[in-house]
From Swiss-Prot:
Residues 374-390, 622-648, 738-754, 782-792 have a biased composition (Basic and acidic residues). Residues 15-26, 762-774 have a biased composition (Low complexity). It holds the Pfam family zf-HC5HC2H_2. The gene is jade1. Keywords: Activator, Apoptosis, Cell projection, Chromosome, Cytoplasm, Cytoskeleton, Metal-binding, Nucleus, Repeat, Transcription, Transcription regulation, Zinc, Zinc-finger. GO terms for molecular function: zinc ion binding. This is Protein Jade-1. SMART domains: PHD (SM00249). A zinc finger (C2HC pre-PHD-type) spans 248-282. InterPro entries: Enhancer_polycomb-like_N (IPR019542), EPHD (IPR034732), Histone_Mod_Regulator (IPR050701), Jade-1_PHD (IPR039546), Zinc_finger_PHD-type_CS (IPR019786), Znf_FYVE_PHD (IPR011011), Znf_PHD (IPR001965), Znf_PHD-finger (IPR019787). CDD domains: ePHD_JADE, PHD_JADE1. A zinc finger (PHD-type) spans 196-246, 306-362.
Length: 829
């Protein structure tokens, strides 16, 4: 079915024109009226003819099935030329083939430059080739003068120095070239054509097409192309790798030097190709080039430890005999030179197996069994076996027997070389030199005779170094420089590795030290925080913590309610039963007076208040009886001990003050004591008036927030055993008392500290405007509870006095430094 087509717009035009494209079958009135030809024409009948209904019957080869979905833009049709007659026609004509003959080129000899050639514009190689390499010495100049005189007498042309140098250089060049060629051919030594010459790697004397035997022109080793990795035989001379580099290294796997060697991957070690093939752990990186030698480090240590049975040296890596139950070891090169039985077998799976045998098993008639080698092997006779029975197979004797033919060949070769060197003049023809240099034959012949005499005087050695050897020497020097630089960089790299390892270890050590210091700092701050918390919250917890740190004990559990410390005589002094009774009577009166204030602050009475109420009732009855009996005597005692009662009443009020108020009061007390230094003298007088014979130190010491006077006996007074305490200054101000001194010294010190504490509190009361903070917070006990407290305090004070009273440090030092000072002091003692 033919579909009607919607006219396209200007956006569909390829040339960007504003004209509208119409179909060929469309009848547009606009196009007829205008008379203009359309810019584009599309045929839609082709698309319509291509479409077939699915029910249409056609052969499969007559149509193509469209797998892609139909697109709407395909309905536009196929674009056709607007005017096919306007298409240009191509014109073709036959052109004759261009001639390949070269054009005229002007000869260089006809080209002349107006400017003279300068030295800088000439190549260095050209200048080097133009320079004569032979220089006349004084002897040559003297001979030249005598010869020119003879030439003048004979009527010949005199000879100049430059011509003589050129002739001598030509003699040396021709002699070297001809002698080298003679040594390489059968005419000279016949080395290449010797039937006994074998490959240094595979020990085979045969060569094949594409696998020729190549000889080194310097060390004269013979190798196959495939055995040494020679891809292409060079024209002229050929040098092996070691000779090309001008080095004579030692094999890394055997003690031998020389031979067909290849470098390892690093380039610093050299290995025989035969050693690399026979040692199973070693491999070759590129089999075509037969280098580099790899996996040398994979050789086990037990192979390096084997000792060669031929050379008796523990050097390199050895191989072992392939016979069963035979573990005789020998080097690969030693076995090859001694003629041991060493075969390469090609298996059916195209694998090469290497079989090597020791001298004992190499003497067997193995040709009949294997049949792979055509070389005759000497089978020892019965006489030889009987002669050699019981004698060790020494390396020297075997090497002497096996190397006799080779030594003979070497000696013959040396003789031939010596003979060639003696007859060096046979390799130079004077007439050829005269023809080449275009000089008179008589003059060249006279110079030839002089050259022969001078060279014989020089022990047949060349007068100038051959150009090739000179280039090789220069290349060798450059190679040596490169090797030295390589070694230098290798050592530098190793040194840098050592420095890096050292810096890593130092940085790791410093990090560990920093971590340790941080841990110690955290421990120190934790101790300080515990001490500060104990000082703020209460003296008892702080003192118990300090005792645990000072005396190396575990931290005792802190009780819920404050309790008196045992062992500190300055704070818990012993009291007699009569004094305790009077104190309980007077304290009960103050407790009764202070009880309403405490209930107002706390809000709810505690369990201790009930005990205090009972104490007040008993104390009131005792007070009534005491008033009827004594009267005025009790009144006088009350007036004399009123400061003590006021001090106790203020201590009860101090327990009810908050922590912030205590801190504020402690700070104000420190400021007051530090600012009012002029009151120290009055303080000393008041303290001396309350003591009988003991001197009291005037400097106040803060211990956990409370002031304390230091006894003068600790600063230079004699201790109970009569020794001075001044020598204990550098030992932490403590010493371990003797067993006989503990009881008496403890009691005496307790009494002195009790008196000092009382005097201190009275002096602080006199000079302070607010009540001072007590050292401990306790409650007064009455009746049986008070008596039980006295018994416990007596026992605790006696034990502490015996154990650790004299070991206590001053309080400011313990608060600042913690247990570290005590530990050092104990270690030092």
């Amino acid at each position: 079915m033919k579909r009607s087509r919607v006219p396209s717009t200007s956006e569909d035009s390829d040339n960007g024109s504003n004209s509208t494209s119409w179909s060929q079958h469309s009848n547009s009135k606009h196009r007829k009226q205008s008379g203009k030809r359309p810019s584009e024409v599309f045929r839609t009948d082709l698309i319509t003819a291509m479409k077939l209904h699915d029910s249409h019957q056609l052969n499969p080869e007559d149509y193509y099935e469209l797998a892609d979905p139909w697109r709407q833009e395909w309905e536009k049709g196929v674009q056709v030329p607007v005017s096919p007659e306007s298409i240009p026609q191509c014109a073709v004509r036959t052109v004759a083939e261009k001639s390949t003959a070269p054009l005229f080129i002007k000869p260089k000899k006809l080209i002349r430059s107006s400017e003279s050639s300068m030295l800088g514009y000439v190549g260095i190689q050209t200048l080097a080739d133009g320079m004569c390499r032979y220089d006349l010495n004084e002897e040559d100049v003297a001979w030249l003068q005598i010869t020119n005189e003879e030439f003048s007498k004979m009527g010949m042309q005199p000879l100049d120095e430059l011509t003589m140098e050129r002739v001598m250089e030509e003699f040396e060049r021709r002699c070297y070239d001809n002698m080298s060629h003679a040594m390489e051919t059968e005419e000279g030594l016949g080395i290449e054509y010797d039937e006994d010459v074998v490959c240094d790697v595979c020990q085979s004397p045969d060569g094949e097409d594409g696998n020729e035997m190549v000889f080194c022109d310097k060390c004269n080793i013979c190798v196959h192309q495939a055995c040494y990795g020679i891809l292409k035989v060079p024209e002229g001379s050929w040098l092996c790798r070691t000779c090309a580099l001008g080095i004579f290294p030692k094999c890394h796997l055997c003690p031998k030097k020389g031979g067909a060697m290849k470098p390892t991957r690093s380039g610093t070690k050299w290995v025989h190709v035969s050693c690399a093939l026979w040692i199973p752990e070693v491999s070759i990186g590129n089999p075509e080039k037969m280098e580099p030698i790899t996996n040398v480090s994979h050789i086990p240590s037990n192979r390096w430890a084997l000792i060669c049975c031929l050379c008796k040296e523990k050097t390199g890596a050895c191989i072992q005999c392939s016979a069963k139950s035979c573990r005789v070891a020998f080097h690969v090169t030693c076995g090859l030179h001694c003629g041991l039985k060493m075969n390469t077998i090609l298996t059916e799976a195209d694998e090469v197996k290497f079989k090597s045998f020791c001298p004992k098993h190499s003497g067997l008639d193995w040709n009949e069994e294997e049949g792979d080698d055509d070389r005759p092997v000497k089978v020892p006779t019965r006489e030889d076996r009987s002669r050699n029975r019981g004698i060790d197979f020494s390396a020297s004797s075997q090497t002497r027997l096996s190397q006799n033919p080779e030594e003979t060949r070497l000696s013959e070769r040396k003789l031939r070389v010596q003979q060639l060197e003696d007859e060096f003049y046979r390799f130079v023809a004077a007439d050829e030199v005269a023809e080449h240099l275009q000089l008179p034959l008589e003059m060249v012949d006279i110079l030839f005779q002089y050259w022969k005499l001078k060279r014989k005087v020089n022990f047949n050695q060349p007068l100038i170094m051959p150009k090739k050897e000179e280039e090789d020497s220069l290349a060798r020097r450059e190679q040596e420089v490169l090797l030295r630089r390589l070694r230098l960089f290798t050592h530098l790299r190793q040194d840098l590795e050592r420095v890096r390892n050292l810096t890593y270890m130092v940085s790791r050590r410093e990090r560990i030290k920093r971590t340790l210091c941080r841990v110690q700092e955290q421990i120190f701050h934790h101790h300080v925080r515990l001490l500060e918390q104990g000082r703020v919250t209460g003296v008892s917890s702080t003192r118990r913590l300090e005792e645990a740190m000072f005396y190396f004990r575990t931290t005792p559990p802190v009780p819920a309610s404050p309790q008196p410390l045992k062992g500190h005589c300055g704070q818990n002094s012993t009291l007699s039963s009569s004094e305790k009774g009077s104190n309980s009577y007077r304290s009960s009166k103050h407790i009764e007076a202070d009880k309403p204030a405490k209930m107002l602050m706390d809000g709810v009475p505690s369990s201790g208040d009930s005990v205090r109420s009972e104490t007040v009732m008993s104390a009131s009855s005792r007070r009534s009886e005491g008033r009827t009996r004594s009267g005025e005597s009790h009144r006088k005692e009350e007036e004399s001990e009123r400061p003590l009662e006021d001090r106790r009443r203020k201590s009860k009020l101090w327990d009810q003050v908050s922590i912030k108020d205590k801190l504020r009061h402690a700070k104000s007390m420190e400021d007051t004591l530090s600012s009012e230094t002029e009151l120290d003298t009055m303080d000393d007088r008041l303290l001396l008036s309350h003591t009988n014979a003991n001197s009291v130190a005037t400097a106040p010491n803060m211990y956990s927030g409370s002031p304390r006077k230091t006894n003068a006996s600790h600063q230079g007074k004699l201790v109970p055993n009569g020794t001075s305490g001044r020598h204990l200054k550098n030992w932490g101000s403590f010493r371990i008392p003797k067993r006989s001194e503990r009881t008496s010294a403890g009691r005496q010190t307790e009494r002195q500290e009790a008196d000092n504490t009382a005097d201190q509190n009275s002096s602080l009361k006199t000079f302070s405007t607010s009540p001072s903070s007590p050292q401990i917070r306790t409650r007064l006990r009455t009746g049986s509870e008070n008596r039980r407290h006295l018994e416990e305090s007596d026992l605790g004070q006696s034990e502490q006095g015996k154990r650790c009273h004299t070991q206590r440090l001053p309080s400011p030092m313990t608060r600042r430094y913690g247990s570290d000072v005590i530990q050092r002091g104990v270690l030092a003692s």
